[in-house]
Regions:
Chain B
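Polyanion-binding surfaces on beta-sheet-dominated domains and ring/shell assemblies
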Residues: 1-258
Length: 249, 258, 249, 258, 258, 249
């Protein structure tokens, strides 16, 4: 259990057409991105998204162990998602639990769908995601950070991975749920896409949505992802500019 | 992937280019589903043995008494565990649940939990005491599509489940209070992409040829979705998978409830 | 603890010369056997014995890991005995406990004593036993199922393994204890033999038996094993007939 | 088995054909048994250090307070653990108890439990509180036949055990209520088959040559038996092993109690 | 050690022979220390992000309610855990805390515990209920000397920590009773020996060249010491390290408290 | 927690200038040493020190696993410190805990500083320490026993390792704390030295000591270690004499 939910089931999540934190239905929380933030990784990124704080870093391509599981046709990309004990209000015991195993898998799957792994046969590429503060939507924040770190590492990618969740609260479809909305809402739909082609790389849902609500929510998540994509591109571009400027100094 | 697996995959893919499946099923056709409810009824309050083609899964329900979650002090608790037993495939190893087993367990769990299939509010006993429904999925023969078999088995076993008698702080084994209150029948349908086609209920050969997959669990609404595995869908493919999943779930629901 | 035992210590287990389920002292419970029941194993068997339901299957001979533990003179046969969580009234936590480790070992030892392992040096043969419903005597049921599965797999065997338990209830020696008799009885004596030569392959005992009671109980268990042997032979024979008939179709 | 082990095995087996043992013992003769009760008496309520030939085992008893089993609410609890410490043999690895340690622990446990050696009914304290006797067997030097050494050590340590004082819900360390109530002295005797002979108390060389083994634990009746290892016995051999076990147990019991 | 590491080590050592460090610091000079208290303040009662040169460590404090130790029924409890996250170095592996992480955690813990930095007597709530302070050190980028970074981070985070409100047996999340009572500021200083010199705050290159190391944690007295690693100190070197540690701790304490 | 400490905080540890067990401030507890006490090790030792009873034994030099962690320049020496469940008043759960992992490491470090490991490249030397009864100061007792066992094994050593703790009780600096002094004292300072050169091999401290108290305590621990060294030398010498005498018989 990530956090204890309070027993107030009839909490109103929409008041006067606005969400609890004053956002419109299609409005994202505040987002800050940065790459190249760690010294010991070949690529790294830091993303603040609402109250979420997530760090991602890449080691590799490097020797894959155990030997007999190596793939002679491509690198094996493994993402490890980890929450700091103090990232949630009720301390999380250190170490992987079932939830983090699942999130690690779906992020690994999404990144592996766009990275050109064929370039590095027999190796392993390890992407580490550290959730330093969690406030709903960590899997989308994590995949965005991981994708930035991977791009920053120089591993060639067919496309970036952008992600955003939508959901249903008080019967309305909204984008990018924060903690209270996630706890008391009726549905969560995280989506990750390769923004240039529009392919779906990650799609999960739990709650309840009619066929029509799904379409609306899906489109809202994709629209959110596209906004994220613009920020990701700018972040990577800025880092290159800084890099060039830094070199000239 | 060894050479035999590669050849199978190749054969499945080339057939699929002509719109044909290796066992001649239609793209949206399930293999035969056989459900034996009450398989372990001498010991387990609920159980169901599922044959999905030659995939075999046994699901058992245990009912225990424990503490509620602090945030829902008057609601029962449910938990889902999947064991990919090594007997089921030479490819499974012994040991603790791994990535694949955990993912299947969590997708099955979400379908049941989010649809409210178990009326957890009726599982309150007294202060700090509620019923815990343990859903244990035991995979015995992996002929493909164990996720759907597990999901069909879980809700079938729940429908079979009796609530034990509880008196003076003690569970009376072998005596029953009535049935476990079940409100609806969520059914997961897994759609796999092979070439430019989507098919349901992949057999083992089709799983070798699978590019990626999407599971959609429905009641009268969508309750859970999970894209799984490397590979991509277009949003049109996702829409198609949702349509198919509603349709097939309806058919399967009749078998489960029937 | 496999199951909670009720506190009724003075429960009568023999009434009017009959056991609780109406059996005579030397009478086995109902037994049903089948082989070739799984698709992914090289050999498999299913046995219902009273309220016990047990499935066994064999993978291998196949590469043995880790390499440095391979035996260049023969295959290493490993049996893994596992109880489903719901096979007993009080849910058993999944995973091996000390009891199942011991039972796995004694079954491995018994099967290894009759299988011609020298034929497959450097390999491993893995026998998996799944207890789907448990009602006393599972180790005998398991060894009978495992032996059928191994025979069904084509691994050559010097003999089958037949097994049956006897015990003492209300001071009387009886064969094949069911749950209540096992819980409130005074002794349990599971025996496995190679039925043609009469060799003892497995022998365990706990409780209390005088020297004479032991002899009586041992003989009863061997007699039970011999009945089991006849059923095992018939089961294997029937499967071959079916196989031939199936082939002719 | 390396070449040295093979030669030892061969030598033991060929001697045995003439009815002789490598250390000139009679077939039913144990090595010297030395028992030092109270070895760890400054900390442990009961203990015994056993030398069985050059096999060394230290057994300690800890007494804790805990809940009874629900089906025996007025009986104490016992539990047996065996640690094959890596110091005892270059062949033991570090780590959690393995197959062999578990089997030894369970055979030792059954002998004590089934004979009723510990009068568990006298270990009741108050509602939901009983004494738990932890029997911890620490194997320090494996010169062969650690099972019998462990079993002899366990009952010796139990006979040495004092029951701590318990007042107002607290165990008073270092003060004692009396002795742990012990009713009898179960003794395991392990018979190994080498060629056509049965011998007791195998040393390490004899264990290499061992075909299979049978442990019989007796008081005035048989309380536990365990055939262990690949290989077979005839029923006559089993009978012989039982006779020998009764006889040797009687001799050893005098050493333990004496 | 690969060839690159060997060359670095060699370079560091030869510079040191001239009394120089690879980054031109004085022997007793720390790299720049940046402390951001309250980094995770939206969720954690206390936290601090430490940059020690390019070493990065995040420490979070969680406050839970639990049982006191039986021997100190009216005192709160503290516990320290260090996670060497694999993101921090290609040399760290995933998995449970290992030798190195445990040693660091225990040295950090001893400094805080033995100095009485947390006034545990003020963490009593009611019978059998006390506050537990969980100190979780998350190492994110290992540029050398993570022990000192962890120790500085731990006490900084404790100084940042608010005590949650506790009413009617429930912790009120997001409401605070006041600050966690902290009595002093223990600071660990790690002295490493390279050739015949002692230096503080080794960077990664200097750690390759390190012969052995001594950590001294001080307040106005010495509270903890730990020699770590293969290699030896003379007693004069130990004395020098203690002097240096008192001096540097004083400077660092001002940064922490400032 | 090794043992439950009683709540008597104001217990007097020094009465009339004497310690609770009658010792002077600079007096060691009774000590007994022996080597060559086990048959299956290449070297072994047994040390009784006050109420502590500790056994140490050495296996190796032998193949080191896993292969990729071998050191081609020297042997890897690993000490494993283990407390028997019954060695303390409140039963310790079997298996390594964080405390024993740390003690294992500091003993490994100290022994590795004097053993000539370069003689055995690519191998492992395993030193096992079994605490059979514990009564404060077990890490010093263990290192003394381990050093004797290593010397007894024939692995060449530049020097022995001698060790002794000092500490502060009732404000006074004393040597070699026993249990009550350790529990209610103000400080513990275990020291291990190579006695011929006087090098410090192990140094730990917890509690509180002023600069001057430290010097006094350190010197007292070193003096204790030197006494231990004399006993260690005598023990090794006696064992050689016995060995020669034994050979002549």
């Amino acid at each position: 259990m990530e956090e204890i939910k309070m027993a107030e089931k009839d909490m109103k999540l929409i008041v006067n057409g606005k969400r609890l934190d004053g956002r419109n239905f299609d409005e994202l929380r505040k987002i800050k991105m940065e790459v190249n933030v760690l010294e010991r990784t070949v690529g790294s990124a830091y993303v603040e998204w609402g109250n979420n704080k997530v760090l991602a870093g890449v080691h590799g391509p490097r020797e894959f162990h155990p030997k007999f599981l190596r793939d002679p046709t491509k690198a094996i990309l493994t993402c490890t998602y980890n929450m700091a004990a103090f990232s949630v209000e009720d301390r999380k015991r250190p170490g992987p639990d079932r939830r983090s195993v699942e999130i690690s898998k779906v992020i690994s799957d999404a990144l592996s769908s766009v990275a050109v792994l064929e370039k590095y046969p027999n190796t392993g590429i390890d992407v580490f995601v550290e959730v330093l503060q969690a406030d709903a939507g960590t899997r989308c924040v994590s995949i965005v950070a991981a994708s930035l770190a991977l791009a920053n590492s120089g591993v060639p990618m067919k496309d970036l991975v952008s992600a955003c969740a939508s959901g249903k609260i008080d019967g309305e479809i909204v984008v990018d749920l924060m903690k209270e909305e996630d706890n008391y809402g009726e549905c969560d739909l995280p989506v990750a896409i390769s923004p240039r082609k529009g392919d779906v790389l990650l799609l999960q849902m739990d709650g309840n949505l009619t066929r029509d609500e799904y379409t609306k929510a899906y489109n809202m998540a994709v629209d959110g992802s596209k906004k994220i994509y613009e920020m990701q591109k700018k972040t990577l571009l800025d880092s290159m500019v800084n890099f060039v400027e830094g070199e000239q100094k | 992937m060894n050479i035999e697996e590669y050849l199978r995959k190749d054969y499945v893919t080339s057939l699929m280019r002509e719109g044909r499946r290796i066992d001649n099923r239609k793209l949206d056709e399930f293999r035969e589903i056989k459900i034996e409810k009450g398989y372990s009824s001498e010991k387990a309050p609920g159980s169901a043995f599922i044959n999905l083609g030659d995939t075999k899964v046994l699901v058992g329900i245990s009912m225990g008494v424990g503490e509620p979650y602090p945030d829902r002090p008057t609601s029962g608790v449910m938990t889902t565990n999947v064991e990919l037993r090594p007997i089921a495939s030479p490819l499974f190893e012994s040991g603790p649940p791994r990535e694949k087993a955990i993912e299947i367990a969590r997708v099955v769990d979400r379908g049941i939990r989010e649809s409210g299939a178990i009326d957890l509010d009726k599982l309150y006993i007294e202060e700090d005491k509620v019923w815990i429904a343990f859903i244990d999925v035991h995979v015995l023969d992996d002929g493909g599509n164990i996720l759907d078999a597990a999901g069909i088995g879980a809700i079938s076993a729940l429908l079979d489940t009796r609530l034990p008698k509880y008196e003076d702080g003690v569970v009376i084994r072998g005596e029953w209070e009535g049935k476990l209150p079940i409100t609806c029948t969520p059914v997961p349908v897994t759609n796999v992409k092979i070439g430019s086609n989507l098919v349901v209920d992949p057999n083992l050969d089709e799983e070798y040829a699978r590019e990626t997959q999407l599971t959609v669990t429905t009641t009268d609404v969508i309750n859970a979705m999970q894209k799984s595995g490397i590979g991509v869908f277009s949003s049109e493919e996702v829409d198609e998978a949702i349509e198919t999943s509603f349709k097939k779930a309806k058919e399967i629901r009749e078998i489960i409830e029937g």
